[in-house]
Amino acid sequence: LTVEDLIRLTMRTGEMAVEIIKQLDDANTSVYDNPSPHTVNVNIKKGPFIIISGHDLKDLEMLLKQTEGTGINIYTHGEMLPSHGYAGLKKYPHLIGNFGGAWQDQQKEFDNLPGCIIMTTNCLMRPRDSYKDRIYSTNVVGWEGVKHIEKKSDGEKDFSPVIRQALELGGFKEDIEPHNILVGFGHEAVLSNAQSIVDAVKSGAIRHFFLVAGCDGAKPGRNYYTEFVKQTPSDSIVLTLACGKFRFNDLDLGEIGGL
């Protein structure tokens, strides 16, 4: 293959990736509506809980329905964080926040948790013995010795074993003062503020846009993007996606004209 052939193949790969993401976006928004900006508490609340991780919004919805009225709090984890922006999911009052950071921190964050965890997709690390009896898998993800939740013939799943164990474990004993971060800035949310953004650019209030994206790594000291975002000028807008966001999404960067 020539260099030109490789460039054409690369461009075609990109086109296919964009189309796949469009189909995924259409599937999510047709069921749960377009994401909109929403604050998410990243600290814990007293009471029994289930943490759900991964990318499968349908699994989250089924869990939310099955835990209504049980007193169980639901926390997202990892790439489930953006679900808080969808109207069809954030309407459940017991979807109360997000627990932990990126995938590589799960072993220390899940250590001796007084609650249950459900992994819906990839990024499951070898569970430690301290929580192996309270972590569940579903879909294509799994680990030897980890309990697996299968899909029934009607497409539904029965999370009652997880619910029972979460109630038995009792959960967190006390609240921690809330700390909120922002999610929900999908393309529809950005476009709905297009005129304000254009006006801010024309006035000079916004001079830079940074999209800081990508998957994170587990090696200690990989804090380049944390330091980068800290040093972005005050006339900047920073957008982020993928698990690299956990390097800096808890930073308070302020607002520009309400944006």
Functional labels for PLM-detected ranges:
Residues 1-259:
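Metallocofactor- and cofactor-centric catalytic cores in central/energy metabolism, strongly enriched
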